[in-house]
């Protein structure tokens, strides 16, 4: 499920209009991916218009097994994709690793 203007962050899975990623960045990943005030290429590379399933995450989500299962229990309230099709570019993954951030693709290919 997706629409033309909605995109899902490939790192955290939050769903927002593309304009929101450009204007405000990602509420969870901005310090890592720097969407805000960046060129559209960063948003194009690190978000996907193709995603499946929706989960609404509220303010008090610590007890939610769904939030824990999707690994979004520490993220800000909003709509999240269950699955985000696509993967971050290798250069972005390398930058994340330099910051000691482990990237788990949200496309279903990661195994625990």
UniProtKB/Swiss-Prot annotation:
Primary location class: nucleus
GO biological process, one term: mRNA processing
GO cellular component: chromosome, centromeric region; DSIF complex
Transmembrane regions listed in the UniProt entry: none
A Gene Ontology molecular function term of the record: RNA polymerase II complex binding
Signal peptide bounds: none
PANTHER family: SUPPRESSOR OF TY 4, TRANSCRIPTION ELONGATION FACTOR SPT4
Subunit structure: Component of the SPT4-SPT5 complex. Interacts with RNA polymerase II.
Descriptive protein name: Transcription elongation factor SPT4
Organism encoding this protein: Candida albicans (strain SC5314 / ATCC MYA-2876) (Yeast)
Gene behind this protein: SPT4
